[in-house]
């Protein structure tokens, strides 16, 4: 499956300054651009369009991605990350694990008394007990480390996450 459009934000400036963007397939872009030159396509206000600070941060971030080969680095770490994530299979309460690149989603079994409670407890324990920042949605733990992560840090992240998952079982 290939998306027609992709929206993105934080990663374009490393989260330093608010900025986002949209990538569209050529045929979609061309459809928007068919109007007269004086007609603004996708008009929605543009309060912060081309903000100089955000654009400077975005360009600097893109330079770092390129100069430090961060995309290649992340691609090389994919197997290590996936293996570490999949090692959590079989832990109590883990229903499913999905990875793509350096992103993982871990579905936890809901507690009978309250949906989302197990993942919420995991988020609290991860932060307070392990110093690990995770995101949750319902009973799903989502995690994506920075692109500068090392293999050793990936191991540390998933060791901490395993302790958290066992603690909330």
PLM features: what roles do these ranges have?
Residues 1-169:
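Conserved N-terminal phosphate-binding loop of PLP-dependent enzymes in the Aspartate aminotransferase
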């Amino acid at each position: 499956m290939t998306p027609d459009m992709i929206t993105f934000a934080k990663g374009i400036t490393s989260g330093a300054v608010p900025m986002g963007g949209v990538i569209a397939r050529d045929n979609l872009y061309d459809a928007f651009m068919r109007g007269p030159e004086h007609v603004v396509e996708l008009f929605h206000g543009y309060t912060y369009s081309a903000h100089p600070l955000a654009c400077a941060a975005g360009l600097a971030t893109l330079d770092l991605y390129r100069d430090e080969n961060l995309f290649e680095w992340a691609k090389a770490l994919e197997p290590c990350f996936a293996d570490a994530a999949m090692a959590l299979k079989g832990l109590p309460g883990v229903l499913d694990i999905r990875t793509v690149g350096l992103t993982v989603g871990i579905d936890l079994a809901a507690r009978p008394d309250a949906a989302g409670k197990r993942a919420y407890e995991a988020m609290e324990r991860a932060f307070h007990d392990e110093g690990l920042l995770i995101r949750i949605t319902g009973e799903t733990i989502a995690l994506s480390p920075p692109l500068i992560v090392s293999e050793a840090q990936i191991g540390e992240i998933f060791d901490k996450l395993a302790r958290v998952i066992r603690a909330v079982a």
